[in-house]
Amino acid sequence: MDQTYSLESFLNHVQKRDPNQTEFAQAVREVMTTLWPFLEQNPKYRQMSLLERLVEPERVIQFRVVWVDDRNQVQVNRAWRVQFSSAIGPYKGGMRFHPSVNLSILKFLGFEQTFKNALTTLPMGGGKGGSDFDPKGKSEGEVMRFCQALMTELYRHLGADTDVPAGDIGVGGREVGFMAGMMKKLSNNTACVFTGKGLSFGGSLIRPEATGYGLVYFTEAMLKRHGMGFEGMRVSVSGFGNVAQYAIEKAMEFGARVITASDSSGTVVDESGFTKEKLARLIEIKASRDGQVADYAKEFGLVYLEGQQPWSVPVDIALPCATQNELDVDAAHQLIANGVKAVAEGANMPTTIEATELFQQAGVLFAPGKAANAGGVATSGLEMAQNAARLGWKAEKVDARLHHIMLDIHHACVEHGGEGEQTNYVQGANIAGFVKVADAMLAQGVI
């Protein structure tokens, strides 16, 4: 493309190349819209087709996964690994197992991951992978056979200095263990090829908690910069996976009153707030097969909003931790009308672009996921460092490093997002991540 093209011309170019990849196009639009004024002031970043290279993955691997279920029926799923950018290190990003997974979603996640990893300042590139396999309702044997079948193809594309996957939606410690074990068997090599491993074979303490803890560390720093804090605040959390669980736990430690949790069936509202005991019980219920927040609400006699998200509940701080685009314009209007002060993304791009703009126009503090939920991948980087050194750090050391990294990310966002009365954290995160990746790409030439 001509180096003098406009923002809309560039976005149309991306849309034309992949007209059906709406999630990916949305991610590119969100990033480029905030970057464009910076790019116009710094024309060196529009040389050598850098932007065109930045939105094109270095490699996309697509393959079939053939496995046998418990009824002895042959099943066929699709799987992908998007190796988006290795400009600053090996590809790094999770594996997602969910029926909604497609190439557009994985490209969007890999694109976001590239900037998120850059923000951590650790030497990690961006990648993402997954399959349309649904682990819900599957036996442990079926999940194991699927993971092993997937690795018979994927293993050849991974390596400690090439591509290091981790977990994501539908992929927890169990699935990581199955995949890492099969990788070791196929490659005859025990080098670190996954993070999020069990503690018995190279995992890191604090890794399961890291995204949720990091989200709260970043949000607390953002609140403090604007004269507030978690202490005494009403907080709503969506979802109840790892991110939501540990965000609730850490927010309670900081003195917040967390009043919601949710799953695909609906939302539980506890006006008195979670306690350690209540949280432990909800975790226990959700860990059981087919356990839902509705069961928890019934047990404790709490309000249950069937089929609804938590955004209609009046709160000071909202932490969307479920999935992409869960918080739309209508939800944003409800939160703003109810006086929300801050929104921080625990999931990957859970807020639509239009909702994000509404929050910013209303003066609501907004922390984008690439900054606020970077704690998970940051601790994955720390796990890689421990594996490379053949060491295991104490939980306190990992947590302290995580807290420090999240404060550094917050500082970078403020530096590039404006140090005035209210920081534009979306702009700050996008520019800070972009500059690191772009400088590396320029230094390495046209490759």
Ranges and model annotations:
Residues H98, N117-E231:
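Glycine/serine-rich phosphate-binding loop and adjoining beta1-alpha1 elements at the start
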Residues D2-A27, M222, I336-I447:
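Adenosine-phosphate binding glycine-rich loop
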Residues T195-G198, G203-P314:
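Glycine-rich phosphate/diphosphate-binding loop of Rossmann-like nucleotide-binding domains
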Residues F63-M124, K128, D132:
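Phosphate-interaction motifs
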Residues G266-F366, A371:
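Rossmann-like adenosine-cofactor binding region
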Residues T162-A166, T190-F194, V237, T260-D263, ...:
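General beta-strand structural signal in soluble alpha/beta enzymes
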Residues K44-Q75:
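Structured beta-strand/loop patches that form or line metal/cofactor-binding pockets in enzymes
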